[in-house]
Amino acid sequence: MTTTPQPPPQPDETPEGAAGAATAGRDPLEIAADLVDDVSRELDPAELASLERLDQPRRILFVHAHPDDESIGTGATMARYAEAGAGVVLLTATRGELGEVIPPELAHLDPDALAEHRTGELATAMEALGVSDHRFLTRPDGTGYRDSGMVWLEPGRAAAGDDVDPRSLAAADPEEVAARIAEVVREVRPQVVVTYEPGGGYGHPDHVRVHEATVRALVLAAGDGSRGAGGAVPWQVAKVYEIVQPERPVREALRRLAETGAEGAGDPEGPLPSVVVPDGEVTTVVDGTGQVPAKIAALRAHATQVTLDLDAAVPAMRLSNGVPQPVWPQEHYRLVHGVAGGPYDAEGRETDLFAGIAPSS
């Protein structure tokens, strides 16, 4: 039997064939590494950052108005989750240019100098809380939103002043502000977002704007990208919380402060700021007892805005209005989006902001 000699096989010069030849006999791990490098070259930096954050199964975004707000309202919570290994991100809307300065020796600072000083205070506070991911909200051109300022109407209640800077957060296009927050949401991809209740805690116009813009931002972030939020992949936040305080403990603390003669103590039976809500509206309490030292260190860092009286019968902090506010070892929240989950405390409140959320969500 004879056979006809066959010509030697010709190399496959198609792209697929070339790729196969290039990988033949190579270590599979080396091939995988090259594939990852190729993906890295094709994705933009924001997309890569989003993928890297998914390595942290639990991610939480706090949206605040000024440096110091994060430590006052959510400092223990931030420290607790940072300590537990969650991805904790702080977004601050302004640099606090118009904050009322408490120390006389710093009263000379003009708005820009105060902003720089408060940025340094915030960096120190973040270090105390163990949080490394902080960013300021910016306009599309990269500039920041300025503090809108406020006036005190009465103890615990503020409002916008008569002369609002056109560069301020309160004067900005609300849809633009919401879209900028939505871009951060899509980048960070948090399961949980925390911000103010509709009254902004005590009426500060920047707090109110942050609440409104964050609510709108979450709608934009979950949308198809046709409006706002840039071109990043849509993201649906699982749970949204508002910062609140339960009325009964607040009034009890005010009574104790009044009984001890604390200067500036509010009326235990009088009106309260919007952050204080009926006890039954509090859905969640985060026990930050172990993080109180970190919270106090963060509050001390904001020396232009906060003074502390920790030796009083009720350990308290004071803002520029001089009214003592208890330094709580627990921080309270109201769930406004999502489903509550256990474990629950004796009063039926959640004890974990991530309760009920699967790590891969």
UniProtKB/Swiss-Prot annotation:
It is an enzyme of class 3 (hydrolase). Residues 16-25 have a biased composition (Low complexity). Its EC number is 3.5.1.103. Zn(2+) binds at residues 66, 69, 207. It comes from the Bacteria. Binds 1 zinc ion per subunit. One of its GO terms (biological process) is mycothiol biosynthetic process. InterPro entries: GlcNAc_PI_deacetylase-related, LmbE-like_dom_sf, Mycothiol_biosynthesis_MshB. One of its GO terms (molecular function) is N-acetylglucosaminylinositol deacetylase activity. Its cofactor is Zn(2+). It catalyses: 1D-myo-inositol 2-acetamido-2-deoxy-alpha-D-glucopyranoside + H2O = 1D-myo-inositol 2-amino-2-deoxy-alpha-D-glucopyranoside + acetate. Residues 1-12 have a biased composition (Pro residues). Keywords: Hydrolase, Metal-binding, Zinc. Catalyzes the deacetylation of 1D-myo-inositol 2-acetamido-2-deoxy-alpha-D-glucopyranoside (GlcNAc-Ins) in the mycothiol biosynthesis pathway. This is 1D-myo-inositol 2-acetamido-2-deoxy-alpha-D-glucopyranoside deacetylase. It comes from Kineococcus radiotolerans (strain ATCC BAA-149 / DSM 14245 / SRS30216).
